[in-house]
Amino acid sequence: MRENRRMFPSGRSMLAMLLVICLCFGASATCLAEAPGAAEPGREAELVRIMNLNLQYLLNDWWNSEKDYVYATSTNFTKADSSLTEEQRLAVQESTRTFVNWREVDELSIFYLDRERAENGIRPVSHLIYCVGLALYDGYYDEDIVGVSGADAEAMCVKLISAVAGEHRSNHPDATDDRYWGDSWQSALWAENIGLSAWLLRDRIAPEIYAKVERMVLDEAHTLIYDYEIPYYRDADGTIVYPGDTKGEEIAWMAKLLALARFMFPDSEERGAWDDQLERMLVSATAMPEDVGSDRLVDGRKVGEMISGSNINGDGTLVNHNLYHIDYMATILEEMGDTIVLYRIAGEPVPEAAVFNLDKIYQAMIEVDLGKYDESRAGKYFYIRDENGQPTGNVEMPGEDDWGKAGYAIYYLCDVMADTLGLDREIEVPRKAWVWEKLHFEKMREQISRQAEDKAPGQFFLPGENSFVSVESFMMHNLAEAYVLAVSHPE
């Protein structure tokens, strides 16, 4: 088990600063009691409990019911006659469906079970693989809470790694159709989720399985170097190229695959190319109009020479799904956070590009008046304040969130990132990241603790509350990131 570290690494300098603030403004001892360095001693333990509660859901109800991983076969419809239509393949699949415990087969057949080779079939599983891998690696997996032994959790994770990586196109070089996944707008994201877990557990994975992962990661990295043009919401002249659709979060989730590749293959001749493209992609993901042509240096390179457009508005907001969308502001922070997590685990300095403009985005979530984009919301903010201007922990946005009810785990991660990386340095003390962090933690705890007839233990959402197919495993992914940044690898 890895040594766990303090949940809120504020340091003596932070405490000294808070003491000065409290004294200068005549605050009482309550000010220090609520400071990040003096947060409730049980917060870290409660975070671990919440993560294990969600793993309880994912490795039991989700695994056995929603994903039917108890139904497994080593021959699936993707290996059937290529002349069959999708409908015919599904008919073959159903006719041969048998109940087999996952322990009794050498390899799970992920596409037999999910019937999808695209996002809905792969992404939720990739997040689960990521989360179980990190829980085992960082040592907070609690089999007493989850109800699945650590050995079984590891076996389940490894079988999923083998199954999903095994269906990547790189492991079927002679295939002439599109049965296998890869080289798509999200495939680098899925590959990094799977690859990170495999890399962390590499000493526990059979060489032939790890080789599948290596081929998958190398193939996706090759695509990003040689067959990928960085997209921009707005070009260098200010013309909107993709109306209503920033490309920032997509670039960020692809970039992290290159970060993984550089650590998995430190001696590769491609490492220089990976690092160069990684730098460009990270900066492009969060570039603002004023960054175009800028002489500002990031990791010793001029920003203006690395980008040819922007994906974030000048005030730190962004547009996605034709909305000024808080979910995607948070998602960019989360995806950039994945790259930071890799550097922290590898013990290397985090590049400046990985935090480029993240402070502007986080500040916008707290400080941008929504009346700028929706007159009916004048005087309101993405992070909601009460009538006295104090943080509440609730969130909103111009228009209605098209995904449904908010998932507070991602906002908690954003706050942890802002607190540990100093993204809130320009924000007034009453609305510092640690204040929101505490509030969003409580919202998240309330969310997972709710009881209802149709809600399984450890589930964040009630049926119908959120339409994102990966929402449960994605919430856990955010918490696993937060744990790395604040506890296991805070610096």
What are these language model-derived features?
Residues 11-14, 29, 273:
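Compositionally biased regions
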Residues 36-113, 134, 138, 264, ...:
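Terminal, non-catalytic domain-edge segments
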Residues 16-26:
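Bacterial N-terminal signal peptides
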Residues 25-38:
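Sec-dependent signal peptide cleavage junction
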Residues 380-397:
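Residue-centric detector for conserved, function-critical "anchor" positions
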Residues 117-359, 367-372, 400-410:
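Aromatic-lined, polymer-binding surfaces characteristic
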Residues 3-17:
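Bacterial N-terminal signal peptides that target proteins for export
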